[in-house]
Swiss-Prot record:
Keywords: Acetylation, Cell projection, Cytoplasmic vesicle, Nucleus, Synapse. It comes from the Eukaryota. The modification N-acetylalanine is found at A2. InterPro entries: RAVE2/Rogdi. It is found in: Nucleus envelope; Presynapse; Cell projection, Axon; Perikaryon. One of its GO terms (cellular component) is RAVE complex. The keyword NADP does not apply. Belongs to the rogdi family. Monomer. It holds the Pfam family Rogdi_lz. The gene is ROGDI. This is Protein rogdi homolog.
Length: 287
């Protein structure tokens, strides 16, 4: 019995030593690695005043789709804003070519990119507050930090992977509609958003439902992409989507950022798992 107790005490001493090493050394090594990765991620979101001199570089993205050539265009991205847009739309009925572009005095903020960058900055801030001089005293303290960092990273990733669901009246009321010169025809709606690593442009063609229409009017709810046949009210009119054209272009640095988010989340989870292993040995007290 004494031998068993001695072995148990020796085992506990070894585990306690391993846990102290984990708290004092490995945790900080992981935090350094996380900071390095997230700083690389933050560099992908190039913005004025981020330490580089001069204006943020402009990137041109040619929009296309393997399913249609009705819409062609180029969007110019500058940091988290669209600074230029040049779009050509071939009308299906008569092949008339419409051209519209951003007014020179206008930029359109891509809130998804701005929000993702802000969440990355918050994650870096949380990590920087626990520098090498900080001594973690409990595993629970590490878990709390990892949960907070993972929350920010998950929110950053979700802002890029989950575009907002908008109703057609919300799209119609958007300031984006008033960005163009010449003014968009009243039978067109435009939406721009990020989906994963892609910059997406959707053009909706509309037609007015006559008061004597036999169609059963059902206003469409919110959606990332509305389908032909979706209906809505705008002012005194009832409108229906007749055609939908979606084109997109890959933004390589957004793909990099998403990879950095995934790797960082995995590192956080691995550290949480290591900490949690010790809880099974000290289930009756804080670990």
């Amino acid at each position: 019995m004494a031998t068993v107790m001695a072995a148990t005490a020796a085992e506990r001493a070894v585990l306690e030593e391993e846990f102290r090493w984990l708290l004092h050394d490995e945790v900080h090594a992981v935090l350094r690695q996380l900071q390095d990765i997230l700083k690389e991620a933050s560099l992908r979101f190039t913005l004025p005043g981020s330490g580089t001199e001069g204006p943020t570089k402009q990137e041109n993205f040619i929009l296309g789709s393997c399913g249609t050539d009705q819409v062609k265009g180029v969007l110019t991205l500058q940091g988290d804003a669209l600074s230029q847009a040049d779009v050509n739309l071939k009308m299906p009925r008569n092949n008339q070519l419409l051209h519209f572009a951003f007014r020179e005095d206008k930029q359109w903020k891509l809130q998804q990119i701005q929000d993702a960058r802000n969440h990355v900055s918050q994650a870096i801030y949380l990590l920087a507050n626990r520098d090498e001089s900080y001594q973690f005293r409990t595993g629970a303290e590490v878990l709390k930090l990892m949960d907070a960092v993972m929350l920010q990273l998950t929110r950053a990733r979700n802002r890029l992977t989950t575009p907002a669901t908008l109703t057609l009246p919300e799209i119609a009321a958007s300031g984006l509609t008033r960005m163009f010169a010449p003014t968009l025809p009243s039978d067109l709606l435009v939406n721009v958003y990020i989906n994963l690593n892609k910059l997406c442009l959707t053009v909706y063609q509309l037609h007015t439902l006559q008061p004597n229409s036999t169609k059963n009017f059902r206003p469409a709810g919110g959606a990332v992409l509305h389908s032909p046949g979706a209906m809505f009210e705008w002012g005194t009119q009832r409108l229906e989507v007749s055609h939908v054209h979606k084109v997109e272009s890959v933004i390589p640095w957004l793909n990099d950022a998403l990879v950095f988010f995934t790797v960082s989340l995995q590192l956080c989870q691995q550290l949480k798992d290591k900490i949690s292993v010790f809880s099974s040995y000290w289930s009756c007290r804080p670990f």
